[in-house]
Swiss-Prot record:
Pfam family, one: HrcA
Protein name: Heat-inducible transcription repressor HrcA
Source organism: Mycoplasmopsis synoviae (strain 53)
Family as reported in the entry's similarity comment: Belongs to the HrcA family.
UniProt KW keywords: Repressor, Stress response, Transcription, Transcription regulation
Length: 340
């Protein structure tokens, strides 16, 4: 997304802030009178017209006012909003930041509160670094479909489908050969290392399977997300929202339950973005990934597209602070025990 000039950013920020408060089209006179804009109304109108030409504002009626488009809301959320809603952060930090409770209980309480305060739906995904694969088997369903059954060290039995696309030259027999190799080499492997370990077996697979790369791709794709503890908070905020189309609700919930918002936003994001953001006709999507000491966590938020991105980003950063503090404390305790 192209960076705007400072003057244009100032006007866009004021328009979005005013619109989120008033939910009406915003005029140049209102910005000058109530929002601290120092330009003349004529200059403001000129800048608003330029923002309209960029697709960031739109005039829907014959009035002189304009409202932000989804593109304008996304630009605001990415570049102009902040993650320092002090009232929200301070109130929750006092309660939760230094709590010695189980981290999952703390995250659950904080996230429930954030979902209630922001009217958004929060999703947390934790990848447990200690889970180990104890058993893995393949069961043929049809010529193009099989099921992988995995047993994990915490007693969970996980099931994953593995499809054979029509454009691939692999067969079920290839998957069975690969499974025999996996059973010999992957048992007692940590789940967080499973994808890496499968890739390391490529030379062995290549000796027995012609299309070994397609086989590896099929298996890796099917086991993505294994060992991740996922929880949705404020589900009702999506279901009951009048600002999200009914036909979009099921699609959004399916994405939240089965996919990574972080990965879904990758195409339109830059590597340097701390929080990935996309705002479109379906809603507003935010995601942050924390990867410290093999503790992979994803925090994602879905809300109506006209939601307050300041509060949402502040909530994400508060959760990040609580999680990283917990990880660092654990590492500190581990190192102290090691040297005691």
């Amino acid at each position: 997304m192209k960076q705007l000039k400072k003057q244009h950013e100032e006007i866009l920020k004021a328009v979005v802030g005013a619109y989120l408060t008033q939910k009406n089209e915003i005029s140049s006179a209102l910005l000058v009178k109530n929002y601290g804009i120092k330009f003349s109304p004529a200059k403001v109108r000129y800048l608003m017209t330029a923002l309209e030409d960029e697709g960031l504002l739109v005039k829907e009626t014959k009035s002189s006012g304009r409202k932000p488009t989804n593109k304008g809301l996304e630009y605001y959320a990415k570049f102009l909003s902040n993650a320092f809603d002090l009232k929200l952060i301070n109130n929750l930090e006092k309660i939760f930041l230094n709590r010695k409770d189980n981290i999952y209980n703390t995250i659950e309480e904080v996230t429930k509160e954030l979902a209630s305060l922001t009217g958004a739906t929060f999703v947390t995904k934790f990848k447990d670094p200690n889970l180990i694969l104890k058993s893995i088997n393949l069961f043929e369903v049809s010529e193009s479909l099989a099921t992988i059954i995995l047993v994990v060290s915490n007693g969970e039995v996980l099931s994953r489908k593995i499809d054979i696309p029509e454009n691939k030259a692999i067969k079920i027999s290839d998957l069975k050969i690969a499974m025999n190799i996996f059973q010999d080499n992957l048992i007692d492997c940590k789940l967080i290392d499973l994808e890496k370990r499968i890739l390391l077996l490529k030379d062995i697979l290549a000796e027995k399977i012609i299309q070994y790369e397609d086989v590896i791709e099929s298996y890796v794709k099917s086991i993505l997300g294994i060992g991740i503890k996922s929880q949705i908070y404020g589900r009702e905020n999506i279901i009951l929202s009048r600002k999200i189309a009914r036909e979009d609700v099921n699609e959004i919930l399916n994405i939240l339950e089965k996919n990574s918002i972080w990965d879904a936003l990758e195409k339109n994001s830059n590597d340097f973005e701390e929080i990935r953001i996309s705002i479109n006709s379906k809603g507003a999507f935010f995601s942050k990934r924390i990867d410290e000491n093999n503790n992979l966590t994803e925090i994602s938020v879905v809300a109506p597209n006209e939601s307050d991105s300041n509060s949402i980003k502040s909530g994400i950063m508060l959760l990040t602070k609580i999680i990283t503090n917990n990880i660092n404390e654990k590492e500190k305790d581990k190192n102290e025990r090691k040297h005691s």
